[in-house]
Amino acid sequence: MTSRRRPRLGGLAAIAALTLALTACGGSGGGTAGGEQKSIKLVVAQYTEGTRPYWDELIKSFEAAHPGKNVDLQVIDWGNLQSQVNTMVQTKQFPDVLNINVFADYAEAGLLYRADEVVSKEVLADFLPSFADNASYDGAQYGLPFVATVNGMYYNKTILEKAGFKKPPATWDEFRAAVKAIKALPGGYVPYGLALGAEAGDYEFGTWMRANGGDWRTGGKWTVNGDRAVETLEFLKTLTQDGYTQPNPGQTNRPDGTWPLFAQGKVGMVYASFGTRAFLDAVDKAGVKYGATTHPTNHGAEPSTHGIQDYLMAFKKDGNQQLVREFLDYFYQADNYAKYLKVEGLLPTTASASTLMRKDPKVSPIVDMVAKARFDPTSQPVWSELRGTVAAELGTAVGPSGDPRAILGKFQQIAERS
């Protein structure tokens, strides 16, 4: 998500097998049998130093409003979260509510409540549709959209103005004209900072692919090597070979590659996370005049951002459903939820919190980008393996001897094994 969290973690197939086995052994009970629970366990990831103080305060106010009810909090850093959750699952010590960046394997194993079983109709309807869809498995929503980042294109206003552009390019044709003009400027500017390295090359490629009218999956089928995908990677290769990027973009990552170049005022345009301090602190400190927008589109594609989200989820346990529901409804009250997002510096997944956060003129333009978010197919079991291969090999396609169609064909074969 941002530098405050880890990327999507691997080992999902093993988790799925484990949870399925536990379910077969009766490790998950119903939510209404055995009497109503008076205490639940909440396990959350630590995003910043403000994580625990926020939850401590929220729980204190919740317990004051619900006498006799208790919420036991456990905060775990991202580096240890998945392994500790694995242990909880293996020993059948399931949390009642969990915050993590995966959910589909637990849903597949029958360990989770559906979203409509643990939040009110009002909360369920408040989730932004694209985030709710991305929290669904096999036609039902199990994950509760928790926090979001959206990614798109930042541009250096000064460089674009020098090149004769008062606004960022909106189409591929305008983009081609812009990078050509920037390259012709004195000063050795990099027209576009392209990061196709292992850190997040799939994010950048996927964003350009959607801007070209393609996607990883279309109509329920994998289209990794579809015509629009191939055209996109060929476009990025041409961009590279024509000298419109920094050297060796196939091995370039964002944090130590394109982002520092942008902060130094050397790059015209770059892919980055909207509002993330890991990117903007250095940019603001350097006094770079910048704007943020969606990537230029082709073939009339709808402008979009790349969305990434983490989830809350509720595990089925005897007697816990009512208290879980009360607590989650309390957390998702607009004021409570918006306060959390402000503490962590993250973006909303609900309409009500979006409305509140738009009152901040610095945050409002970024919040408006959330509704444009499109997502990677993270609920597909093969995605973890596919993304790992893409991360390792995608960058080779834009080298002098790279073959975009061949490399995407290899990725397609991996996807279709699912």
Q: Model-derived features: where do they sit?
A:
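Extracytoplasmic/periplasmic substrate-recognition and gating elements
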Residues: K60, A64, A163, T238-T245, ...
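Extracytoplasmic "Venus flytrap"/periplasmic binding protein-like
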Residues: K60-F127, S136, E161-A170, L261, ...
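A structural signal for short loop-to-beta-strand junctions that line the ligand-binding cleft
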Residues: P95-D96, V123-L160, E302-P303, A373-Q380
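Hinge/lid segment of periplasmic solute-binding proteins
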Residues: N101-V150, E204, A211, K289-T293, ...
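Long, aromatic- and glycine/proline-rich binding clefts that accommodate carbohydrate-like moieties
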Residues: N134, T293, L341-T389
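Extracytoplasmic/periplasmic solute-binding protein
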Residues: Y142-F146, N151, D173-T223, V267
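Conserved C-terminal helix/tail region of periplasmic/extracytoplasmic solute-binding proteins
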Residues: E161-K162, D368-S418
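Glycine-centered hinge/linker elements that transmit conformational signals in sensory
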Residues: V179-K180, K221-G250
